[in-house]
């Protein structure tokens, strides 16, 4: 079971990772450390040659049974740290500003605890220390490598700075939004700015398209569903006295329900093309699917709550986040459940002064160990 020495070890691992962050698909030293720490506990590491970074490990219980997976992401962000911590990043321009160092150390702790509880495991627990979550590419690599073959369910977490330590946010259904990107190119006819009647002004059309897109959600998506359309870049022209040939805009759409995700782009296309045509211009609409939404399987809600209760921790109804998470790609393949882990942080994710309370390390380690035991006892 967890004790002071265990907690101290988790802190040391987390601080080591924090001091030496590595960007997506560059987590070479991070991978070596994870392997070493697991090998020190005689935990089996699976050979997955398709993964150049990241670690897949496994603990088999003394009883045959299903295989479940627990995932932790391991990459950092291109951010200059401003925490002034004694263990602040030693890598210029790179920081664990989203707490993946916390996730990694915690789930190594879970593996350590479950290694001591093999007799209780009615099946196998596979640990996925995943690279490149920040660029939404790591989960795809893990799936392509076949790591989820034969796995019945997968579990994961994200630290939550606005929840106190010892509090876990749980809910069934949508938790994090789908993430998609769009581009719109408005093609007009360039000319002299003083003679606009001889041109087709793509900027004028673009302005109206921006306004028109604001109605896509409010007038086309159910008020019982959530969706956001954000235009984040608009570009046109190179000179103050020339009407350009075209204008461009791009942005992101966030949704929680599949129905909304499917409906939004067609409404956007109709608005863009219709308004452009009214100005005598043409609109070319492009849609780039990025990530689905995190959808928690309600089958595991009771287990997620029971694990916390057994340990004396509190669960609360998790608030949805419009952020994206490539854990959702696993959930497209197998059932899964993702939780918020309270860390009582000072700043939100991706902030250069992001910190968290290290007391949450042991909480997270214990929680996922208990959850694994319960799920393997109850999974159909």
Curated annotation (Swiss-Prot):
Keywords associated with the record: Amino-acid biosynthesis, Cysteine biosynthesis, Hydrolase, Metal-binding, Nickel
Gene3D superfamilies for this protein: 3.30.70.360, Zn peptidases
Phenotype of gene-disrupted mutants: Cells lacking this gene do not lose the ability to grow on 2SC as the sulfur source because of the presence of other deacetylases that can compensate for scmP (yxeP) deficiency. In a triple mutant lacking this gene, ytnL and yhaA, the levels of NAC highly increases after addition of 2SC.
Catalysed conversion reaction: N-acetyl-L-cysteine + H2O = L-cysteine + acetate
Cofactor(s) essential for the protein: a divalent metal cation
Cofactor: how and how many bound: Binds 2 divalent metal cations per subunit.
One annotated GO molecular function: metal ion binding
Residues involved in Ni(2+) 1 binding: 98, 134, 350
InterPro entries referenced in this protein's UniProt entry, alphabetically: Amidohydrolase, Bact_exopeptidase_dim_dom, Peptidase_M20, Peptidase_M20_dimer, YxeP-like
Catalytic activity, EC: 3.5.1.-
Family: Belongs to the peptidase M20 family.
Function summary: Probably catalyzes the deacetylation of N-acetylcysteine (NAC) to acetate and cysteine. Is involved in a S-(2-succino)cysteine (2SC) degradation pathway that allows B.subtilis to grow on 2SC as a sole sulfur source, via its metabolization to cysteine.
Name of this chain's protein: N-acetylcysteine deacetylase
Organism: Bacillus subtilis (strain 168)
Lineage, uppermost ranks: Bacteria, Bacillati, Bacillota, Bacilli, Bacillales
